[in-house]
């Protein structure tokens, strides 16, 4: 799946719908950005936007929105209940999927540098992007707000990270940085506000004070009573769900509730949640209850049920899980893998250089892993092979994962070839040489990745050959031969492209790695076939 970053800019306008809509349009019109939510507040005179995209697109979206704010918002006339210091007050970048915090820090720095250069405004870094302790938190930087900014900018220690140390009355200054995804999460308690707050004091990081900290890191919380639901809630913010997961919070609150002889009536997530957080919860309950669930949709369903996420209102994964709200159109991102079998085969046989052997090898390897998984499924859950269930639980996940991981390489190989041809067509010069080298190495690394992923299957396949349902013997044989053929085909692509590579060290290390994988595949195939040949009912 592609990289996904969330951006949550707060603009100092919550009353003028024309301006609010203009900023929304700037985000929507940015290629690669998906606007998920617009939340204006009249009393705060502030609007919070939530949009997502890949790292490059997300920065462009933030820049386009800020340019509109620079033109339309006049801070000399701004009044509202919320603290602020600029037309764009704060612009955090948040990792959602396949993105590191470091990449989000880079997004914030690129945004700060580019916007300060393009419209000439002061930009401060905060949270993970800041390296100075006295100006790391938003409240530290924003102290004094817009009204105190002119004098603040005169101090050397408050020199902006980007842009001029100059007060711009109509704009002010902005803060940008990177932070973890914040999850607003409430656990429902059949009790009083005071009892819910007692639980909150037990679990939140701050606890009851410095001398009595709570049990869970990166957690803020209070207790309150919700008349609409007729129950109390432990209302919390998870500042880092990777360190303290939703399931951990639910279990800890439930434990304290039991000790107080209180009932727990599920929980609710307010706003959006990353898929990863839900899958982490599912994996926890799968391990706790010794379940065997591979399918993602079933994992999501399990987490919803165990956490009671639909207890207050229906939890619709398609509308509440951020990854599903920006579901990639596979016909666009993976056109080859989305074709019919007939269509793909006919395209292979057409008068075009791509798709070719590399894409075919990825498909053949994926089918090989798939047939290995099929053998496992034809064994697992059957009364006749009940004694083998624990073994199938071990073997099925890596084969299923390899099958799914290989499918995108059908398109990736063709894309890499096309990028190389494009680089070859650029005008001669140093930039052309750099572009060709980069594209060529990508055209080598893609089939090498096909080999690496495929190579992870041999251990499970050797064991599957020993224990799998013999009624699927021929399926497993075809699968293993397909996997070996896919590896061989990818090896041929690696080898042919290495001939044009001028980086001797890269050629040597890649050749060695590819040859080792091919040798292992050929030897492993023979072992599997021998095991199957010798097995009897």
UniProtKB/Swiss-Prot annotation:
Family: In the C-terminal section; belongs to the cyclodeaminase/cyclohydrolase family.
UniProt: folate binding residues: 163-172
Region (Linker): 327-335
Reactions it catalyzes: 5-formimidoyltetrahydrofolate + L-glutamate = N-formimidoyl-L-glutamate + (6S)-5,6,7,8-tetrahydrofolate; 5-formimidoyltetrahydrofolate + 2 H(+) = (6R)-5,10-methenyltetrahydrofolate + NH4(+)
Location of the protein in the cell: Cytoplasm, Cytosol; Golgi apparatus; Cytoplasm, Cytoskeleton, Microtubule organizing center, Centrosome, Centriole
Encoding gene per record: ftcd
Pathway participation: Amino-acid degradation; L-histidine degradation into L-glutamate; L-glutamate from N-formimidoyl-L-glutamate (transferase route): step 1/1
Active-site residues annotated for this sequence: 82, 413
Lineage: Eukaryota, Amoebozoa, Evosea, Eumycetozoa, Dictyostelia
GO biological process, one term: L-histidine catabolic process to glutamate and formate
Top-level taxon: Eukaryota
SMART domains associated with the record: FTCD, FTCD_N
Designated name of the protein: Formimidoyltransferase-cyclodeaminase
Chief localisation class: cytoplasm
SUPFAM superfamilies given in the database record: Formiminotransferase domain of formiminotransferase-cyclodeaminase (SSF55116), Methenyltetrahydrofolate cyclohydrolase-like (SSF101262)
């Amino acid at each position: 799946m592609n990289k996904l970053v969330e951006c949550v800019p707060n603009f100092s306008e919550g009353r003028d719908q024309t301006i609010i809509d203009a900023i929304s349009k700037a985000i929507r019109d940015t290629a690669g950005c998906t606007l998920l939510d617009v939340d204006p507040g009249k009393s705060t005179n502030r609007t919070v936007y939530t949009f997502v995209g890949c790292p490059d697109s997300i920065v462009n979206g933030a820049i386009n929105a800020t340019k509109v704010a620079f033109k339309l918002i006049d801070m000399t006339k701004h009044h509202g209940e919320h603290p602020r210091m600029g037309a764009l007050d704060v612009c955090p970048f948040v990792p959602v999927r396949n993105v590191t915090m470091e990449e989000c820090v880079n997004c914030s720095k690129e945004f700060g540098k580019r916007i300060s250069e393009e419209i000439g405004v002061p930009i401060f870094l905060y949270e993970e992007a800041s390296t100075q302790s006295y100006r790391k938190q938003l409240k530290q930087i924003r102290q004094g707000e817009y009204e105190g900014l002119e004098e603040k900018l005169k101090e050397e220690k408050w020199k902006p990270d980007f842009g001029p140390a100059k007060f711009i009355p109509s704009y002010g200054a902005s803060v940008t940085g990177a932070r973890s995804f914040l999850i607003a999460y409430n656990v429902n308690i059949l009790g009083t506000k005071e009892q819910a707050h007692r639980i909150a004091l037990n679990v939140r990081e701050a606890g009851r004070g410095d001398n009595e900290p709570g049990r869970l890191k990166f957690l803020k919380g209070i207790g309150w009573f919700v008349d609409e639901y007729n129950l109390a809630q432990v209302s919390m913010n998870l500042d880092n769900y990777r360190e303290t997961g939703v399931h951990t919070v639910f279990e800890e609150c439930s434990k304290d509730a039991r000790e107080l002889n209180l009932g727990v009536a599920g929980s609710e997530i307010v706003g959006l949640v990353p898929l990863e957080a839900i899958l982490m919860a599912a994996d926890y309950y799968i391990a706790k209850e010794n379940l065997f669930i591979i399918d993602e949709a079933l994992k999501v369903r399990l987490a919803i049920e165990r956490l009671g996420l639909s207890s207050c209102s229906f939890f619709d994964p398609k509308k509440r899980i951020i990854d599903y709200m920006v579901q990639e159109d596979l016909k666009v991102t993976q056109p080859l893998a989305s074709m019919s079998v007939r269509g793909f085969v006919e395209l292979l046989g057409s008068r075009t250089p791509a798709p070719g052997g590399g894409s075919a090898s990825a498909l053949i390897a994926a089918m090989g892993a798939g047939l290995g998984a099929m053998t496992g499924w034809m064994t697992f859950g059957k009364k006749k092979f009940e004694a083998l269930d624990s073994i199938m639980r071990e073997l099925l996940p890596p084969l299923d994962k390899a099958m799914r991981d290989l499918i995108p390489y059908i398109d990736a190989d063709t894309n890499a070839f096309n990028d190389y041809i494009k680089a070859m067509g650029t005008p001669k010069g140093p930039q052309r040489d750099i572009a060709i080298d980069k594209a060529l190495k990508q055209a080598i690394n893609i089939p090498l990745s096909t080999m690496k992923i495929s190579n992870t299957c041999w251990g499970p396949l050797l064991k599957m050959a020993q224990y799998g349902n013999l009624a699927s013997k021929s399926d497993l044989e075809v699968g293993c031969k397909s996997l070996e053929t896919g590896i061989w085909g990818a090896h041929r692509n690696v080898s042919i492209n290495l001939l044009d590579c001028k980086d001797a060290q890269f050629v040597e290390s890649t050749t060695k790695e590819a040859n080792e994988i091919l040798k292992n595949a050929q030897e492993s195939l023979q072992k599997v076939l021998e095991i199957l040949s010798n097995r009897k009912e």
